[in-house]
């Protein structure tokens, strides 16, 4: 599939307090039409700076940007992309933020309508004209229905919850029928329940409109819920990028692994084991194993196989299965009991089956 967004070898530098700061360094990111692409990193990683180059809210220092096949920036061969052309281009890229940026003195309806004040369409002769009042009214009504706010059209921002305010912001961002929607920490000011509701809305809009979504966040759970691809940023660089499934199945960088651990209940379970009476001590012929598996591996009776093949016994203390992009991912924490040779054979079987596992060892009880 063709990339709708191509950021090639981008760097962004600026002067701050008398020194040169590199916010983004040689970043390359290609996003295909229809992707929900998560860009994750801690504060200061450069993720917002990078993504804001997509609509030239942030001008790069060097590199190249191609949007929907059109080159809009090239440090080697400068492109004239200013004025009316730039404004028209930006209308096709919607954007929502952590702080909703609504106009407090305007109603929900008029906040959305505000985005249409300079909107134009082509008439039957191919000439551009501004929307009529009726066309604007119809458009706003349609958008409010799309985000489930039609009954709140005459309310003011002060009368809305955080989630409702973000829905208004989303409707406004969609006013000019953008092909790309950028969410810059769009859920970070919301509680977990409202965050899930907004993510569900974004997924629904993605399915209904076919819009490409670029999601900036510092929360891997947000990426896990909605994205199909992920880029991880650190110190201005993209250190890892892949499909969501491959990132979770085979993370390469330490930071990526840290982010994944924040979403995993198995890690919390493992951390709690040191205070568990039941596992205060393991026998000499026992090992504690953490096993991860996915996809078709879940269909195979791996635990049953090793007990039959290698004369070991198991005791499962934790099990979990969840879906990522429709593909099941599972984790087990279990004891493996048997002679050292039989346990080694069982672990070799895990390797043969391409299963990820780690030996957690003996669990010594800690004292508070």
From Swiss-Prot:
One Pfam family cited in the UniProt record for this chain: NIL
Membrane topology listed for this record: Peripheral membrane protein
Role: Part of the ABC transporter complex MetNIQ involved in methionine import. Responsible for energy coupling to the transport system.
GO cellular component: plasma membrane
Single Gene Ontology MF annotation: ABC-type D-methionine transporter activity
Species assigned in the record: Lactococcus lactis subsp. lactis (strain IL1403) (Streptococcus lactis)
Subunit-structure text: The complex is composed of two ATP-binding proteins (MetN), two transmembrane proteins (MetI) and a solute-binding protein (MetQ).
Keyword rRNA processing: no
Full protein name: Methionine import ATP-binding protein MetN
Catalytic activity reported: L-methionine(out) + ATP + H2O = L-methionine(in) + ADP + phosphate + H(+); D-methionine(out) + ATP + H2O = D-methionine(in) + ADP + phosphate + H(+)
Family: Belongs to the ABC transporter superfamily. Methionine importer (TC 3.A.1.24) family.
UniProt keyword terms in alphabetical order: Amino-acid transport, ATP-binding, Cell membrane, Membrane, Nucleotide-binding, Translocase, Transport
Locations listed in the record: Cell membrane
Higher taxonomy: Bacteria, Bacillati, Bacillota, Bacilli, Lactobacillales
InterPro entries assigned to the protein according to its UniProt record, in alphabetical order: AAA+_ATPase, ABC_transporter-like_ATP-bd, ABC_transporter-like_CS, ACT-like_dom_sf, MetN_ABC, MetN_ABC_transporter-like, NIL_domain, P-loop_NTPase
Positions with a binding annotation for ATP: 41-48
Enzyme Commission code(s) on record: 7.4.2.11
Chief localisation class: membrane
Domain ABC transporter: 5-260
């Amino acid at each position: 599939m063709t990339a709708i967004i191509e950021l090639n070898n981008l760097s962004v530098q600026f002067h701050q307090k008398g020194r040169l700061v590199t916010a983004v360094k040689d970043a390359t990111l290609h996003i295909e039409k229809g992707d929900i692409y998560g860009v994750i990193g801690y504060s200061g990683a450069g993720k917002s700076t990078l993504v804001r180059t997509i609509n030239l809210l942030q001008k790069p220092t060097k590199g190249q940007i191609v949007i929907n096949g059109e080159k809009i920036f090239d440090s080697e061969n400068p492109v004239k992309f200013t004025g009316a052309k730039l404004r028209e281009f930006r209308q096709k890229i919607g954007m929502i933020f952590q702080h909703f940026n609504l106009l407090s003195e305007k109603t929900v309806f008029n906040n959305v309508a505000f985005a249409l004040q300079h909107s134009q369409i082509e008439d039957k002769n191919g000439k551009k004209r501004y929307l009529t009042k009726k066309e604007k009214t119809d458009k706003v009504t349609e958008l409010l229905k799309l985000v489930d706010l039609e009954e709140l059209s005459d309310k003011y921002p002060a009368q809305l919850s955080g989630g409702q305010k973000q829905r208004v912001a989303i409707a406004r961002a969609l006013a000019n029928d953008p092909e790309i929607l950028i969410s810059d920490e769009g859920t970070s000011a919301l509680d977990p329940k409202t965050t899930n509701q907004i993510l569900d809305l974004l997924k629904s809009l993605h399915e209904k409109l076919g819009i490409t979504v670029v999601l900036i966040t510092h929360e891997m759970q947000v990426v896990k819920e909605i994205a199909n691809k992920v880029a991880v940023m650190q110190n201005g660089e993209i250190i890892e990028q892949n499909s969501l499934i491959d990132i979770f199945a085979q993370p390469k960088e330490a930071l990526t692994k840290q982010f994944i651990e924040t979403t995993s209940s198995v890690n919390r379970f493992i951390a709690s084991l040191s205070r568990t009476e039941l596992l205060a001590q393991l026998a000499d012929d026992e090992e504690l194993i953490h096993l991860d598996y996915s996809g078709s591996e879940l269909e195979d009776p791996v635990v049953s196989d090793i007990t039959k093949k290698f004369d070991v016994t198991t005791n499962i203390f934790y099990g979990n299965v969840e879906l990522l992009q429709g593909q099941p991912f599972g984790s087990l924490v279990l004891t493996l009991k048997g002679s050292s040779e039989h346990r080694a054979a069982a672990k070799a079987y895990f390797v043969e089956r391409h299963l990820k596992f780690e030996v957690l060892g003996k669990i010594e009880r800690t004292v508070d």
